[in-house]
Amino acid sequence: MTTHTNSWPAGTPCWVDLMASDLERTQTFYRDVLGWTYSESQPEYGGYCNALVDGDVVAGLSPTMEGMEDAPHVWSVYLATDDIAAHAAKAGHAGATQLLETMEVGPFGSMGMWADPTGAAFGMWQANEHTGFTRVEEPGAVAWCDVMTADPAAAREFYAAVFGYEYQDIGDDSMPYALFTVPGGDRPAGGIGGPAPDAGDAQPGWSVAFQVEDVDAAAERVRRSGGSISSEPSDFEYGRMTVAAGPDGEVFVLMTPAETM
């Protein structure tokens, strides 16, 4: 079991959440697919709840907030910060557009949302009582986060300026991809890449991969539970994966990492 109880290093993907048009339906879907249980919804925070795996927090769900009914349903990825004001200033200087003003979320921490210069939206989270994921890289928990954009070079420059990312190229000319490591990190924390050749006019964005024990079985659970599969299970260098969508069309990846990953 991979658990984490402290604040995550700055720049590390530390949280993901989703606004759902029907919270109960979405909770049921992810319970069936990933085995999640849930904390009580908190009315004072818009009905927000945490998804749990054996009591550890792995993601957040909330009803669609008032005034955001037309917003796309996507999994939002939050990058850790130990000083949200300082990192917000760096993001602005590096060309980001602020989408949601920074705010305190009760005793839990502070957050804001931005779009990087390539148009990919991301959040920042400065932890207080809520430090982010307390379980990762286990079935039901987040295994990987990355950002895919038509201009990965610009994205790399931006995140290096804001968070000090260092990169290791593992892609090629047809599909550039680099692993990023945060300052002081001893292993990659995520990735930045360009779209696959057959991706068409894919929108830039951060994505999340949830770990499962058996990708093929999980894909069948997605279908049975009312979701869809846009990319059938297949092997790749680092394991086996499939691309899925949930009840609101929100896209996510299911993956089983290779034992050597």
Q: Language-model features: where?
A:
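Active-site-adjacent scaffolding segments
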Residues: P43-V136
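Extracellular/lumenal glycan-associated surfaces
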Residues: L18, G35, A121, S207, ...
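Vicinal oxygen chelate
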Residues: M1-W8, T12-S21, N50-A51, T64-K90, A94-A143, Q168-G185, G193-P197, ...
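Core segments of cupin and vicinal oxygen chelate
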Residues: T3, S7-A10, C14-D56, H93, ...
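Short loop/beta submotifs within extracellular cysteine-rich repeat domains
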Residues: T26, W36-Y38, V57-A59, M68-E69, ...
